[in-house]
Amino acid sequence: MVSVGFLKSMFNVSGMVADLKSSNFSIYGQWISYLNIIFCLAFGIANIFHFSAVIVFSIIAIVQGLIILFIEVPFLLKICPLSDNFIGFVSKFDTNLRRALFYLVMCAIQWCSIIVQSTSLIVVAVGLSITATVYALGAAAGQEFKNSAILSDRGRVAASVTNEAVVRDML
């Protein structure tokens, strides 16, 4: 049985409450993006067993899920050994407008999967469409991009980021 104290230690509850009160669309976009990571990976794997061209869209969904993971959880860029080109690519998505356009392209790719066959990849397309819309609303409202406090660890993450070289040497 999982205790409430354990769950509170795993998630930054005070950060979640602060995020809800912020009324910032970029934070809501990040929350939906966390779901999109799960959707892309789960439905990508589930649809890879089709014997049609849907396999291509399944593989694309899995890759999209991994790219979203690195875009929405920037701490992973610090601890995973990645190429400078990939880090530069991911770092470009630092505004609401750029993220909205990125998600718009990704959802358009997944909507094209319907041409081949209607599958559960529609869930991925809908999720990416919602994320693109939320980020576009943030850009239209002129809101500054902010990172969510859900995954932060009350200051410990900031201390870890300063010791980036130590983490990379350990890996």
UniProtKB/Swiss-Prot annotation:
InterPro entries given in the database record: TVP18/Ca-channel_flower
Annotated compartments: Golgi apparatus membrane
GO biological process, one term: vesicle-mediated transport
GO cellular component, as recorded: Golgi membrane
Keywords: Glycoprotein, Golgi apparatus, Membrane, Transmembrane, Transmembrane helix
Residues modified by glycosylation: N12, N24
Membrane topology: Multi-pass membrane protein
TM ranges: 25-45, 51-71, 96-115, 120-142
Known role: Golgi membrane protein involved in vesicular trafficking.
Family stated for the protein in its record: Belongs to the TVP18 family.
PANTHER family: CALCIUM CHANNEL FLOWER HOMOLOG
Protein name (record): Golgi apparatus membrane protein TVP18
UniProt organism field: Kluyveromyces lactis (strain ATCC 8585 / CBS 2359 / DSM 70799 / NBRC 1267 / NRRL Y-1140 / WM37) (Yeast)
Name of the encoding gene: TVP18
